[in-house]
Amino acid sequence: MEESETVLKLRRQLKEAEEERVKAAHYGLELLESQSDLQNQLEEQRNEMTGTIENLEQEKYSLQREVELKNRMLESVTSECENIRQQQKLILEQLQEQLERNHHRELGEIKDKLEKLKAELDEARLSEKQLKHKLEYQTEVLANKSEELRMMSERVHETMSSEMLTLQLEKTELESAKANLEQEVNELQYREQQLLLTNGTQSRKLEHLQTEKEEREKESVGYFSALEKAREANQDLQAQLDIALQQAQDPNSKGNSLFSEVEDRRAEMERQLISMKVQFQSLQKQHAFSRQQMHRMKVQIATLLQMKGSQSDPEQLERLQAMVAQKNSEIEALVMKVRQLEKSQQVSENGPAVGSSDNLGQGDETYYVDLLKMKLLNSSKENEKIKDELSLQRMKALAESQRVLELERKLFANDRHLKLSQGENMKLRVSLDEIKMKYEPDEMGKIHTQKRRKEQLPLDFPMDNTSAAVTSGTEAQGLYDATAGETCTAESTDGRIHSKEDLSLSTKEQDPSSVAVKPKELPNGPPPKERKRVRIMEDENNAQDLNKRNTHNCSVTSASPRSTSEDATSESKRFDEEQEKRKQERKSRLRAPPVLHVPSKPNATTQCPQQ
């Protein structure tokens, strides 16, 4: 039940996907028609816009000439005002910079004095602290010495031995040495504190010097910018001087008829130049728009090819579903047969017991029983021989089916790799176009004008259930396996001939299957590039022998793990139906003009020719 539900669910999903595919095709046709209409409207609007823009540019040019004549009268006054303003501005900026420099200088001097006073204050505090510590230490030492003198004076009056006196003297000497060492340690600590203080002052001085260095760098940058501004002003003045010299040498002021005629021709040529510029800009915008559309279309084609490579073939899925359903039915039949055999075995086990009781009553019929046993043994031996032959034929059929499945699996894997490589190739082309558009736009335009390529979208073709039919995809895959580096597109007839030869060699090396090449004929036009279709077919003699063996095996046993006879008959029927469908579709294509469809699901037929 669960398997049937899954099969129904998958069929429903397949039907929905086919409906979506048909809808997408209709929508694509509508979009193409609307795009052509919009393209025509855009062309008309562009022509109108170019005409209006040209008229407006001519009017603009005439008005500009009038405005220039009027502006020349105002330029002298504005130039004088601007010069005065610039002079005042420069003076003000110089004063501000001078005041800022003086302020920074005074501020730095005050900071230096403050740092020096802080350092002197820290040194005075440290020296005061050290003197206090020394004073405390000297008072302690004085108290200890006075105490020792008092103790010595008391002990002098007492009677002591010479040893005690020597020990006492040694003790005093050691204490004096200890006091000297402590004093040295304190002096070293004082020295360390002074060094730390001087280190801190030096670090502060270093920071101050770094800040001064940064300020000097900023001042140098300011001076450099001022120098650049002065250079720019000098260049402007030089340009104004050149303009003034040209105006002084203007032939219009002389009133010569030849120069006036030349001026009229120049104005007319400028008008023509304006019109040509307007047309060039409009054509350039149109070219950029079409290039963006082509780039977007290439990106979409790359994504579609990648989706084709990632998705699976619906006809292959249907065939696998049919095989799964057939194997499930075979398993059910085998289970029923096993149950029947178990029941018959139980009956046969119960039968001999009853027969033995009858034999006790009928001892005279033992001869007939032995005869029947001998016949039964002979028939069982013949049955075992037939079963051995049947198992051998089954193994052969299983090996053949496994070989066919392996070849189909390899073919579909190669087709998938081909689609992925085509998607990657299209992405690389898109990235190459982007890089050329980014770094070499002029070269890109020249290449497009010199060499044009026509890319054809992959069309949908029905596939056989028994043979995986692939078009130029398998051709390019065989070429890739044979040469390890060539692409799926051929730019000349020689390349196509070489690809055909490589394809024939590669298909002969892969499997002993026949290759059927069927070119597609188109009405009303030159014949296009031939599309090849590789089909795996079994040999007729092998198929007939296999059908005979399978019919014989099916007569012996009702069901088997590999019912090859039913598969062969069903596959032959499907093959005939597919051949009839192809003939009808070929007739319909010859009658009606071909329509370009963009498939929403992957197909085994892919082609990327370049013309």
Swiss-Prot record:
Q: Where in the cell is it found?
A: Chromosome, Centromere, Kinetochore
Provide the protein name: Protein Spindly-A
What lineage does UniProt assign to this protein's organism? Eukaryota, Metazoa, Chordata, Craniata, Vertebrata
Q: Per its UniProt record, what InterPro entries does this chain match?
A: SPDLY_chordates, Spindly/BICDR_Dynein_Adapter
Q: What does this protein do?
A: Required for the localization of dynein and dynactin to the mitotic kintochore. Dynein is believed to control the initial lateral interaction between the kinetochore and spindle microtubules and to facilitate the subsequent formation of end-on kinetochore-microtubule attachments mediated by the NDC80 complex.
Q: Which family does it belong to?
A: Belongs to the Spindly family.
Q: Where is this region: Disordered?
A: 487-611
Per the record, the major location class is nucleus
- Keyword terms: Cell cycle, Cell division, Centromere, Chromosome, Coiled coil, Kinetochore, Mitosis
Biased composition of type Basic and acidic residues is found at: 493-511, 570-583
Polar residues composition bias: which ranges? 552-567, 602-611
Q: Which organism is the protein's source?
A: Xenopus laevis
Q: Which residues form a coiled coil?
A: 1-390
Q: Name one GO biological process term.
A: protein localization to kinetochore
| Gene responsible for this protein | spdl1-a
The molecular function terms of the Gene Ontology recorded here are: kinetochore binding
